[in-house]
Structure formats: C-alpha cells, structure tokens
C-alpha cells in the first residue's frame, strides 16, 4: 500500500494543502461517525440512559487523553523539521523515540484511568441513573488507550512527510470493524454499554496494528525497527517543548468542557442525550477546522525549517480561508437537515429540543474556532507552542469557568450555557491572531541569521 509523499517545500500550495487536509478531516469525521454509531446503536437498541452513559464520558475521556495527544503534535513538528532540514538519520532516530513514547503514554493513561474512573465521574455530577453504566463503559474503554496512542503518534510520523492517507485507511478498517462488532455485541449478545466499549477496544487494536505495519515498511528515513526503540532525550525534549503546551492547552480546554458538561448534567438525561446527539455534528464541523490547523502546523514546520518565510505566509492565508469556508458549508448542511439528523439518535421530543438549542447556538458558529486553531497551528510550526496555549487557556477555558459561575449562574438556562462557546471563540481568536502576526514578524526577521533548531 504505497503512498506518494507530498512535497511541502516546492510547487503550488493550494492543491497540496487540500490533498493533505482532506484525509485528516475525513479521518476525524469518520471517527466521529463510528462514535455516533456507538451512540445510535445503544440509543436505538438499548435505551436513552445507555446513550447518556456513553455520551457523559466524552468530555472526561478527552480531558485524560489530551495531554498525550498534544505530545503527538510535538512529534509531528520535530520529525517534520528534521525532514525540512534534510537530516534523514536524525529523523529516523526521532521516529523510534516517538513510537516508544506512544506505548509508554498509552499504558500510563490505562492505569490512571482505571483508578480514577468512578471518582471523576462522581465529580462530574453524572446522574445516579446513569452513573453505573457510565463507569462500566469508561473502565472498558481505557483498555483501548495503548492502541489509540500508537495510532495517534504513528499517524503523526506519517503526516510529517506528507502522508495523511494511510492513517485514513487504518481508521476506515477499524471503523468498519467497530460498527459490525457494535451491532453483534448490542443486538445479538445484548451486552449494551459493555458491548460498545469492547468493540471500541478491539477496533483500535486493528488500527494500531496497521499503523505499525506501515511504519515497519516505510522508506529508510522513517522506517520502524523494534530493535532500535529507545528514548533519545534531545528528541523527547523537542517533543515536550512543542507538545506539552499543546497537550496542557487541550487538557485545560477539556477541563472547562467537563465543567460545562456538569452543568448540562443538571438538566437530566434528556439534556445530556440532546447535547450528546448534537455534538456528533458539531464535532464534524470542528474536525474540518482541526484538519487545516494540523496542515498549517506540518507545512509551516517544514518550510520554517527550510527558512522560506513567503511560503509560510501563504500557508497561513490558504489554510485559514479554505478551512473556515469548508467548516461553514458543513455547518449549514447540518442546520438545514437538523431534524432528520438528530432523529438518527432519538425521537424523544425533549431530547430533540435540547439538541436544537445547541445546534443553533454552537454548531452554526463553529467556524470561529478556525481563527485561533489555524493561527495557533502556524505558531506551533514555528516552534512557539506556549503562546497559543496560554492565550487559549485564558480566553477559552478560564473565561468559560467564569461564565458558568457568574452569568449562567444568574440566568440559568440551556441557551445561556451554550452561548459561552461562541463568545469565548471570538475572544480567543482575536488574541491568538494578534500574537501570530507579532511572533511571525520577529521570527522572520531572524531568517538567515540562525538555524531553525528542533529544540
């Protein structure tokens, strides 16, 4: 299964950006569709409470895995820079550090998750009628984490050279397996929530195996040899420098969503189910933005290492325009067919009511996330991961916590809770964009005066 890499350093950019970003967006959207299949199967063939149990875990899962997922961003930047500088031997050393880090981090998440699962769900005010099922789902789900980390980090390595297609192949294979097992475990064996979680573990095992196969059959620069697995500290430090702020940003970001989820939980199982159903479409719109943000990071990493400032500027403009336009188009499709889409998950009028509120106030405005995501992606590509992290934590996370405890507390309604999303996006987007242009001017003034080091 050969895949021609994308030359990010030469030639027209528009087609290459789209070709690179499209598999990323499709990968995330397909992953969400497969997650939606989990919800649809338990919602239709088990109960709304089972769907709420699965859905109530989403923010918590993101909170725990985000730190290590951020490290995969650092891995992508480190390997991409080495490729941009033409340092093939060093790139291969970095690959082996990345893969071993993935295995270690996956088992760390598994251990921590198993210990803290019931405690954290209790802190989130998960309703009593959902708590037992939610805990069961989460504890089984965490056994998938080593496989998820191998997939994420391995995909980051492949993307660093312009290959975003083969991770998509692995995801499609795993997703089909997941859907089939969902139907078998829930409908045939009546396993309910446990069946959905077990299917997730098995399907992620297959995606991890495929990524490892791709890496062991790569060209020499990125080829994985298990005998060479070791942590090389200079690359680990480079990964941490870029990835840790990104991971902490995502982790704190997820923490603010956990707080919002706790507020959503106060509206009962209908409010949880409605929010969970709508989020399937909201996330898909965001994944388009995230794909172009990842594209901006990888393309900027290689071209910044090659010291091509004009190409870096063009990457920012193209990723922003194409990303925002694509996200808006997808959001409008979801809005036009909102009733049909939501009824895939539930036909209960109360559930649909809550879903409609979230779709109008959040999904429609999802393109606003692109303003800070793509600017932040370019900053990370230049080696500045702390700046977007701090701004996002303050402008999005801290602001949301303040909103929930002040404005929402004084005017308690589902709509008032949802409005915090677009307001925080505007604040954060403005600040990150300003920071990007200031940082870009300073960095580009140094082009030719020093080497773009990986750490």
Positions of the model-derived regions?
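Residue-level signal for short hydrophobic patches within transmembrane helices
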Residues: 10, 14-33, 37, 60-67, ...
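Transmembrane helical elements of multi-pass membrane transporters/channels
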Residues: 19-38, 140, 174, 203-207, ...
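Short runs within selected transmembrane alpha-helices of multi-pass transporters and secretion channels
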Residues: 72, 140-159, 167-175, 196-211, ...
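Small-residue-rich hydrophobic transmembrane alpha-helices
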Residues: 51-111, 148-167, 261, 274-336, ...
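Hydrophobic/aromatic residues in alpha-helical transmembrane segments
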Residues: 22, 38, 75-76, 116-117, ...
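Transmembrane alpha-helical segments of integral membrane proteins
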Residues: 398-408
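Helix-terminus/linker motif at the lipid-water interface of multi-pass membrane proteins
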Residues: 29, 33-52, 121-128, 184-191, ...
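Short alpha-helical transmembrane segments in multi-pass integral membrane proteins
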Residues: 1-21, 79-144, 177, 188-244, ...
């Amino acid at each position: 299964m050969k895949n021609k890499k994308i030359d990010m350093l030469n030639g027209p950019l528009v087609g290459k950006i789209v070709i690179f970003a499209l598999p990323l967006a499709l990968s995330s959207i397909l992953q969400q569709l497969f997650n939606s299949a989990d919800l649809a199967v338990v919602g239709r063939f088990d109960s709304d409470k089972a769907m709420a149990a699965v859905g109530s875990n989403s923010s918590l899962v993101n909170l725990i895995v985000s730190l290590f997922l951020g490290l995969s961003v650092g891995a992508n930047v480190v390997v991409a820079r080495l490729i941009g500088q033409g340092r093939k031997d060093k790139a291969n050393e970095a690959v082996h550090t990345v893969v071993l880090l993935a295995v270690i981090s996956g088992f760390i998440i598994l251990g921590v998750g198993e210990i803290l699962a019931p405690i954290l769900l209790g802190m989130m005010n998960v309703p009593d009628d959902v708590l037992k099922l939610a805990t069961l789902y989460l504890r089984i789900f965490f056994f998938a984490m080593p496989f998820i980390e191998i997939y994420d980090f391995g995909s980051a390595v492949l993307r660093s050279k312009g290959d975003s297609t083969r991770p998509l192949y692995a995801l499609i294979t795993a997703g089909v397996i997941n859907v089939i097992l969902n139907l078998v475990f829930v409908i045939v064996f009546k396993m309910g929530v446990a069946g959905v979680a077990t299917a997730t573990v098995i399907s992620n095992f297959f995606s991890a195996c495929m990524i490892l196969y791709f890496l062991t059959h790569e060209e020499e620069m990125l080829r994985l040899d298990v005998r060479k697995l070791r942590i090389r500290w200079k690359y680990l430090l480079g990964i941490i420098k870029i990835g840790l702020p990104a991971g902490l940003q995502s982790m704190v970001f997820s923490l603010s969503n956990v707080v919002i989820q706790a507020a959503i939980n106060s509206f009962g199982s209908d409010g949880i189910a409605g929010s969970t159903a709508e989020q399937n479409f909201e996330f898909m719109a965001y994944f388009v933005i995230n794909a172009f943000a990842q594209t901006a990071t990888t393309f900027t990493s290689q071209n910044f290492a090659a010291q091509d400032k004009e190409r870096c500027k063009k990457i920012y403009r193209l990723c922003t325009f194409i990303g925002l336009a694509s996200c808006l188009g997808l959001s409008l499709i979801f809005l036009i067919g909102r009733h049909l889409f939501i009824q895939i998950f539930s036909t209960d009028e109360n559930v649909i009511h809550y879903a409609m509120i979230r779709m109008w106030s959040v999904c429609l405005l999802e393109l606003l996330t692109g303003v800070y995501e793509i600017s932040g992606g370019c900053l990370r590509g230049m080696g500045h991961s702390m700046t977007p992290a701090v701004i996002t934590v303050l402008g999005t996370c801290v602001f949301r916590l303040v909103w929930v405890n002040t404005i929402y507390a004084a005017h308690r309604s589902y709509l008032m809770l949802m409005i915090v999303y677009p307001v925080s996006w505007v604040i954060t987007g403005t600040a990150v964009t300003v920071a990007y242009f200031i940082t870009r001017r300073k960095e580009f003034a140094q082009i030719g005066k020093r080497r773009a080091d990986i750490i």
